[in-house]
């Protein structure tokens, strides 16, 4: 991962002055101390210019780290480092599969993966950016993990030979902030080059944590493709080779750890239907996006004790069923109250059902979204009851969200 230039010496990060300054600034900001006052206090501590900016950035980033890390009050990330860091639950699930193996982490960033490694699992992490490497070491200490951090280029042949004894080669390659990252060649280090260089010796396997945009047809080697969702969002595509491979395709839904594993031939998805067919609802299910992206819809519903029909597939995948059911494969469940064909009918349905607000869940431009939403909500009673409006095959579905 490439970091912006802060102009600070990486070795300073290992000194107690740095950690103490970050902790103090975090406490001051937690107490709503104005930033001007914070900088004045740092100046009195002898921290000015780039050092002060760096300390403030790391301290402020802790507040945003809350959504990714349980020890967010203690971690050391820059804004860019946190942006690319693997969420703690996602990293822990991956490292659980690598438990007991020695591992070399190529391109460790600021330590989002190696914080899960234990003393019994020999681990070396390589990072080309010295500043990132120093922060990674700090985060390893925060989590009481065990990993050696090495500054170097993972594709350097002399460095690669050092890792010949390691059983697993792991890499979460860097992709620039403007990159679409739809091919392996865009990534740094390129997984294909990693496999060529590190494949000279026999290993348990390679593991790559890839951007979710990459399609399976872009991966030209035999591997298990693990589609990971976190908090209802498609988050990662993990790739496992060798003895680490369990199947051809899998889905991991976090938190919770629900898994689907499958090999060809894959099950057919539920039969399609439309809003006015006899197979329709009234229950509507929004499928977890990792399930949809993996094309394992048939496997996801095969063991459920209800019959489902496919209502929509594309930007979101919607199923319908005559009875309610709860399952980790469903991101949300709705109960459809009305099926109408025009927006004036939607507005009338909202009024009759006692709703005060409406959320639109169909393709519409941002400008049109608010115009249509305001027109639907105009004149509705005050309150908190919110309806969700879908549009499928030209039909508007007025629904209310239920607990899954």
Where are these regions (language model features)?
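SAM-dependent transferase fold signal centered on methyltransferase-like domains
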Residues: 1-404
């Amino acid at each position: 991962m490439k970091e912006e230039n802060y102009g600070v010496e990486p070795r300073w990060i290992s000194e107690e002055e740095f950690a103490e300054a970050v902790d103090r600034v975090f406490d001051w900001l937690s107490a709503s101390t104005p930033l001007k006052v914070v900088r004045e206090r740092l100046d009195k501590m002898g921290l000015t210019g780039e050092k002060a900016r760096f300390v403030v950035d790391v301290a402020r980033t802790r507040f945003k780290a809350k959504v990714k890390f349980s020890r967010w009050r203690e971690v050391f990330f820059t804004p860019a480092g946190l942006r690319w860091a693997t969420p703690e639950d996602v990293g822990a699930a991956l490292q659980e599969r690598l438990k007991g193996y020695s591992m070399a982490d190529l391109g460790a960033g600021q330590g989002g993966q190696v914080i899960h490694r234990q003393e019994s699992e020999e681990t070396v992490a390589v990072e080309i950016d010295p500043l990132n490497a120093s922060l990674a070491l700090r985060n390893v200490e925060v989590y009481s993990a065990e990993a050696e951090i090495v500054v170097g280029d993972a594709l350097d042949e002399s460095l690669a030979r050092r890792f010949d004894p390691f059983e697993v080669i792991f890499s979460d390659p860097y992709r620039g902030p403007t990159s679409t990252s739809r091919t392996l060649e865009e990534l740094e280090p390129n997984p294909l080059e990693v496999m060529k260089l590190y494949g000279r010796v026999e290993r348990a396997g390679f593991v790559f944590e890839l951007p979710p945009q990459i399609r399976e047809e872009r991966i030209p080697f035999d591997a298990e493709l693990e589609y990971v969702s976190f908090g209802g969002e498609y988050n990662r595509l993990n790739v496992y080779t060798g003895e680490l491979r369990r199947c051809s395709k899998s889905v991991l839904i976090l938190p919770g750890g629900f898994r689907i594993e499958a090999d060809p031939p894959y099950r057919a998805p539920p039969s399609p239907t439309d809003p006015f067919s006899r197979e329709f609802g009234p229950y509507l299910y929004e499928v977890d996006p990792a399930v949809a992206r993996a094309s394992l819809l048939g496997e996801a519903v095969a063991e459920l004790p209800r019959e489902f029909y496919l209502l929509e597939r594309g930007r979101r995948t919607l199923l319908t069923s005559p009875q309610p059911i709860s399952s980790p494969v469903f991101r949300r469940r709705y109960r459809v109250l009305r099926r109408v064909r025009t927006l004036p009918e939607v507005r009338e349905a909202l009024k009759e059902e006692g709703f005060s607000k409406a959320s639109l869940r169909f393709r519409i431009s941002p400008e049109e979204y608010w115009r249509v939403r305001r027109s639907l909500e105009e004149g509705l009673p005050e309150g908190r009851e919110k309806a969700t409006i879908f549009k499928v095959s030209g039909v508007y579905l007025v629904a209310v969200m239920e607990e899954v």
